[in-house]
Every structure is written in C-alpha cells, then in structure tokens.
Amino acid sequence: MNMMQVMQSVVWAVLLWPCLVSLGVPLECKDEQGSIILCASISKEKLLDRVIQHAELIYRVSEESCTLFEEMFVPFPMRSQRNQAGYTCATKAFPIPGSKSEIQQISDKWLLHSVLILVQSWIEPLVYLQTTLDRYDDAPDTLLKKTKWVSEKLLSLEQGVVVLIRKMLDDDMLTTSYYEQGVAPYALQPEVLESVLRDYTLLSCFKKDAHKMETFLKLLKCRQTDKYSCFLH
C-alpha cells in the first residue's frame, strides 16, 4: 500500500468520526485520552460509505434551512435579486473545480483537499450566520438548530482533518484555516433588507458547496470500484 492509499484510508476514518453520533453508527474511534486514532476494524469501503451518508445529510439539512429561510423572510420578488445586488459566493474565488470536466480530471488527493477547503471556508461564515439569525424576531427554532448543528459538524470535521494531515505529512506550518477572506464581507451590520439578502445568499451558497462536498466524495467512491466509468450527472 503506497502513501496515497494510506493517507486516503486514514482521512476517511477521521472524516467519519464527527458524524458517527448523528448517524447513530456505533463506532469507537478514540483512545482513553481522547486522541483520534485509526478505526482499523472498519474497512475503507464502509468508512467511505458512511462519510458519503454524512455528506448527504449535511446537504439535506442545508437545503431544508435555505428553503425555510426563503419561505419565512424572503419575498418572492427578492429571490432573484441577490446576484443583482452584488452578492456572490465567497468560495467562488477559491481553487475548487467547478465544471464537470474539471472535476472528472482532478486526482483523488485533490478531491479530498477540495472538500477540506470547502469545510474550512464555511466555518466562520456559519458562526456569523448563527449570530445574525438570533436577531430575527420570528426565526424558528428549527432553523437556528439546523444552522448550529451544521456549524458544529463542520468544526469537528475541520479539526480532525487538520490533525490528520499534520501527523501524516509532519507539517508544523499547517494552520487550522486556509481561507479567511470569506469572513470579511460579513463583519458589518447591514440594514434589515440588506441583511436578509446577505443571509439568504449565505444559505444558498452553503447549500451549493455542501452539494459539491457530496459530489466529490461520491466520485471518489466511484473511482474505488470502477475508475473508468465514473461520470457526473
């Protein structure tokens, strides 16, 4: 087994750890001191399957949150205005493959790296989103709980992957966040209408990126079984 295969196996184990509680899968991945260790008893295939299940769940929750926010706070005429108002997804500028042809051509390593970049880029914006949603008079508890849940899962996921990469690559210069420029646009206190559009854009962009995470992981899964017959739909 080469280094890439070893890295992928351990990445899948660490990626799995934060989501096990939410998925109800009985698995112990920690030692008595609380350190994350490789779940050697679980096959690579099963680990990846559970990671994909977790990614699907995150995407579904993001979709539900976006729909709920839209129904509660966004008048129909405003739903097509967020792009016209100059709001774009912060991750659009990141080196993440976007087109189907680009995604098909990148390596397994870069698929995983892209997932990590997306996770890290959303940690701070989702913390901001929790804060601003708390100021909405009629924000339903369901929306607040969904946002908090996703935020916590992303943070756990990021911490596990960073620890893994530092250990595997012996890279002391690795920081816990690659991208922070996505946070800056949300530091100001906008007016009510602007705030609604901005938060709506955040939720919509996160839903799109959550779908990318799911897509990348499913492509990775496909490549493990039939590398030459994996196509994006």
Curated annotation (Swiss-Prot):
This protein's record includes keyword Secreted: yes
Tissue/organ expression: Pituitary gland.
Single Gene Ontology MF annotation: growth hormone receptor binding
Record-linked Gene3D superfamilies: 1.20.1250.10
Family note: Belongs to the somatotropin/prolactin family.
BP GO annotations: animal organ development; growth hormone receptor signaling pathway; positive regulation of growth; positive regulation of receptor signaling pathway via JAK-STAT; response to nutrient levels
Disulphide linkage map: C29-C39, C89-C205, C222-C230
A GO-annotated cellular component: extracellular space
Signal peptide, first to last residue: 1-24
PROSITE patterns in the cross-refs: SOMATOTROPIN_1, SOMATOTROPIN_2
Keywords: Disulfide bond, Hormone, Secreted, Signal
Record protein name field: Somatolactin
Function: May be associated with ion regulation and reproduction.
SUPFAM superfamilies: 4-helical cytokines
Location in or out of the cell: Secreted
